A protein has these predicted regions:
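Re-entrant/interfacial helical elements at transmembrane boundaries that shape
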Residues: 2, 146-151, 179, 221-229, ...
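Transmembrane helix boundary and interhelical junction motifs in multipass membrane proteins
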Residues: 45-50, 141-144, 155-157, 174, ...
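Transmembrane alpha-helix interface/packing and boundary motifs in multi-pass membrane proteins
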Residues: 37-43, 137-142, 165, 216, ...
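Membrane-interfacial loop-to-helix junctions in multi-pass transporters
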Residues: 23-28, 122-124, 151-157, 169, ...
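Hydrophobic alpha-helical transmembrane segments of multi-pass inner membrane proteins, especially
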Residues: 1-120, 166-197, 201-222, 251, ...
Length: 286
């Protein structure tokens, strides 16, 4: 995707870009994204599909696509989500979605668990309900390190934030969010300072992936968003997740090093130019 955008920008100057060219750029990016989404659809992995959609959105935004295209698409998606929820909550809506449109039962159960977690607390929403109770029981300062009074299945995975909130309370959860914000801020600074377009788009995709993971995981365990099985970066148990996150951090550190090297070369070039000018001035040439 990054190579496709860089190739497009090299062939199209900023002043020559039109809505038609921006639309074809989106199609090029989508051509790389849709096959991955298709594979994830076969695996019924909706959470990871949302992650790739977040990466797709971030790359499209930074590529400079006109808001005349982005805004209508965003409004259409927002309207579609609102319409879906209206149908889902209406009388006979769930039957229509399941029997007519073929919506899987497990997806409907996840939405029900999100909308009414305590109505099914003894069956399919036991984990979500217990997680929200654990967060609430933490209070302001928490119950203390390694103190977990509530049983939450597999809490070391997607529900790890409930442990932090229960043990360290609101203050501990807020500190974790501030650390994530600081990390994202540093990554954005590195990305914006980079002169390499290819690296810029790759790092943007990684940042969007990380931000979505944080937003979705904490939003899901607190009941703001549906539970989709997205891990909390650098904290949740999972080998592949931590490896991919560390690869992304390594990329950002490499970009930071290259930025410093580039700045040092520019300083050396300016100093050399100043010395050459001073020598010419001493010889009376200028």
């Amino acid at each position: 995707v990054s190579r496709a955008i860089v190739h497009f920008l090299r062939n199209n100057r900023e002043e020559d870009r039109t809505l038609k060219k921006d639309f074809f750029l989106i199609l090029q990016i989508a051509a790389y994204t849709i096959p991955v989404l298709g594979l994830l659809a076969f695996q019924h992995d909706f959470g990871t599909s949302l992650v790739f959609m977040a990466i797709f959105s971030g790359v499209v935004l930074i590529s400079g696509v006109s808001w005349k295209i982005i805004l209508p698409v965003f409004l259409t998606l927002a309207g579609g989500i609102a319409l879906f929820l209206a149908v889902f909550l209406s009388d006979g809506g769930r039957a229509f979605l399941h029997q007519t449109l073929g919506m899987p039962t497990y997806q409907m159960n996840r939405i029900l668990a999100w909308l009414n977690p305590f109505d099914y607390a003894q069956t399919m929403t036991f984990q979500q309900a217990q997680g929200q109770l654990a967060i609430a029981s933490g209070g302001l300062l928490g119950q203390g390190f390694n103190v977990s009074n509530l049983l939450i299945p597999v809490r070391e995975s997607d529900m790890i934030f409930t442990v932090i909130a229960e043990d360290f309370g609101f203050v501990g959860g807020l500190c974790l969010l501030l650390l994530y914000m600081f990390l994202v801020y540093k990554m954005l600074r590195i990305t914006l300072k980079s002169n390499n377009q290819f690296y810029t788009y790759i790092s943007t995709g990684f940042i969007m992936m990380l931000v979505f993971h944080i937003f979705e995981n904490i939003g899901a365990v607190t009941g703001i968003l549906p539970l989709t099985g997205i891990p909390l970066p650098f904290i949740s148990q999972g080998g592949s997740a931590i490896v991919s996150n560390l690869i992304g951090i390594g990329l950002l550190l490499s970009m930071s090093h290259q930025n410093r090297v580039s700045e040092e070369r520019k300083k050396e070039s300016r100093l050399l130019r100043q010395k050459q000018l001073s020598r010419l001035h001493e010889k009376g040439i200028i």
